[in-house]
Amino acid sequence: MYLDRGRVDRIVKGALTLAFALALAGGTAKAADTLHFAVGPLQPTPGETKKAFDPFFKRLAEQLGVTYTLEATTDWAGIAVALTSGQVDVAWMGPWGYVIAHNQGAGDAVATAKYDGKPVYHAIVIARPDLQISKWPDDGKGLRISFADVGSTSGWLIPTFWLKSRGLDPKIYFQYHEGATHAANEIAVANGQTDLATDYDRNRTAMIESGAISPQATKIIWTSDDLPNDAIAVRAGLDPAVAKKVQDIVTAITDEQATTILPKHYTGFIASTHANYKLIEDAGIAVGALKNQK
């Protein structure tokens, strides 16, 4: 399989900032004594993401006996390119970003994150609380909607797949915009800058708990079926013994340990393979973002 060329061009642009940052870090991703880690935009800002996830990566590096660098990306697409290009050795990434990377030659997923004890989450569509939407998507036709960046599973791929599988093109059906972060989507709906937006349940919960939005600021009008949670993925060419150690270390994290090294609600990992993300890959093919190479 290969990624549609138009999508590649857009995704590569999202990786440039990360590539520059990694270059500044010095060294090479293949250095035996240093591993380069990256994490996608799981918090409102890269700084917050890095702070929240550094304890996990620090512990991983210590148990592997290596030093490490850590970068937090500004979008989901950029981390996929970074892993594919070998700038990153181990990445905590969204399911769609992982599938993009895998289909461009990156290595496999070795673990799937558990959130509140479950290895699944859900895409959602949120709306202004004053909107009367009882039937989706019918009652949303013609309204303003903000999708996340094209590397996002819940913010772009899954809602696009769901709509297109019903014969609807979101770019025509709505007043469409894409490219926002999930946090920006929640804020935009809360502030009335858009009528509708995509998000995922974990992010909305985290923003409510942090006080970034109130529970009444937005309302959920659509929820997807279960989706596999974030992947811990390794680059192609990483020593298989190191990849196995990464898997063993992260899947050994207990619920108690998770409370000290992982952000709230994350409770550890299960061992994983690429097969666990097949439904994401199938959705990518269905919307034309991934094509069979025949």
What are these regions (language model features)?
Residues K13-A25:
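Bacterial N-terminal signal peptides
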Residues G27-A31:
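Sec/Tat signal peptide C-region and signal peptidase I cleavage site
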Residues F37-R59, Q63, W96, P119-E186, ...:
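Bilobed "Venus flytrap"/periplasmic-binding protein-like clamshell domains
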Residues A38-L42, Y115-I124, A212-V250, K264-L279:
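Periplasmic-binding protein-like
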Residues T67, S146-W162, D248-K294:
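Ligand-binding clefts/hinges and TM-proximal coupling segments of bilobed small-molecule sensing domains
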Residues T67-T74, I172-T181, K219-W222:
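Short beta-strand-to-loop elements that line the ligand-binding cleft
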Residues A77-A91, Q104, D138, H182-R202:
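Short helices/loops that flank or line small-molecule/ion binding pockets
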Residues P95-G105, W162-S165, A190, D195-P215:
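A ligand-binding cleft/hinge motif common to bilobed small-molecule-binding domains
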